[in-house]
């Protein structure tokens, strides 16, 4: 397998805890995993072992890539069944899950998914719009799955709710290879955003007490608990 050099180290993938009704979604998850491995990129994801989450994490892990899953303790019984792959960090809630996924990642990719995937995607886009981060965000538009979302965003631009320049805060493509190429070439949109340094200073001033995390290191069932 030919290795392709990347400017990233860790990619956060948002995706469904369901596999969807069509095989193209599972194929896209497997293709994305292969693209990550080809570029020696580590995977950060929502920690589940079911649906597209399970497929992409298994494929990356079995190909020799590093996998980090981050999941709220409350969801562990629902989203983890059987084997897990790589390292899994249990956190307190959904807010901490998203914050930790963002902190551990250099860019973001959304596969098809439901409300949760959409919420995660739109939040990191909003963070980019506000200048909280300047990391690339990519939408894997498998067989037109996100066409209506893209149409909605175009409508928001046309009606003056999103600046035309900020329409390009994220990129989209129909396949993993093209999408990752666009992410590699991405340059941050700096039109009207608040300086990232101001957010970082405010975060240090208001830094909350760190929550306890539990780490599960396993490629079978959850076996080892380490309190941090």
Curated annotation (Swiss-Prot):
Keywords: Cytokinin biosynthesis, Cytoplasm, Hydrolase, Nucleus. Its main location: cytoplasm. GO terms for molecular function: cytokinin riboside 5'-monophosphate phosphoribohydrolase activity. InterPro entries: LOG (IPR005269), LOG_fam (IPR031100). Disruption phenotype: No visible phenotype under normal growth conditions; due to the redundancy with other LOG proteins. One of its GO terms (biological process) is cytokinin biosynthetic process. Its EC number is 3.2.2.n1. The keyword Nucleus applies. GO terms for cellular component: cytosol; nucleus. It is found in: Cytoplasm; Nucleus. It catalyses: N(6)-(dimethylallyl)adenosine 5'-phosphate + H2O = N(6)-dimethylallyladenine + D-ribose 5-phosphate; 9-ribosyl-trans-zeatin 5'-phosphate + H2O = trans-zeatin + D-ribose 5-phosphate. It comes from the Eukaryota. Optimum pH is 5.4. Substrate binds at residues 79, 97-98, 114-120. Expressed in roots and shoots. Detected in vascular tissues of roots, cotyledons, and leaves, axillary buds, immature and mature flowers, fruit abscission zones and ovules. It holds the Pfam family Lysine_decarbox. Belongs to the LOG family. This is Cytokinin riboside 5'-monophosphate phosphoribohydrolase LOG5. It comes from Arabidopsis thaliana (Mouse-ear cress).
């Amino acid at each position: 397998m030919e290795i392709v050099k990347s400017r990233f180290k860790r990619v956060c993938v948002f995706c469904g805890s369901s596999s969807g009704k069509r095989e193209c979604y599972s194929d896209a998850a497997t293709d994305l995993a292969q693209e990550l491995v080809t570029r020696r990129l580590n995977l950060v994801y929502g920690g589940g072992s079911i649906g597209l989450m399970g497929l992409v994490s298994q494929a990356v892990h079995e190909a020799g890539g590093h996998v980090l899953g981050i999941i709220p303790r409350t969801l562990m019984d629902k989203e983890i069944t059987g084997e897990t792959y790589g390292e899994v960090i249990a956190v307190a809630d959904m807010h901490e899950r998203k914050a930790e996924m963002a902190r551990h990642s250099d860019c973001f990719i959304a596969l098809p998914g439901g409300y949760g995937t959409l919420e995660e995607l739109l939040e990191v886009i909003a963070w980019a719009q506000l200048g909280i981060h300047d990391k690339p965000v990519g939408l894997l538009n498998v067989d037109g799955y996100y066409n209506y979302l893209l149409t909605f965003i175009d409508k928001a631009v046309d009606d003056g709710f999103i600046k035309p320049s900020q329409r390009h805060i994220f990129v989209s493509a129909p396949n993993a290879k093209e999408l990752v190429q666009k992410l590699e070439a991405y340059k941050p949109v700096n039109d009207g955003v608040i300086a990232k340094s101001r957010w970082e200073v405010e975060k240090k001033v208001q830094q909350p007490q760190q929550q306890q995390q539990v780490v599960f290191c396993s490629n079978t069932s959850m076996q080892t608990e380490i309190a941090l």
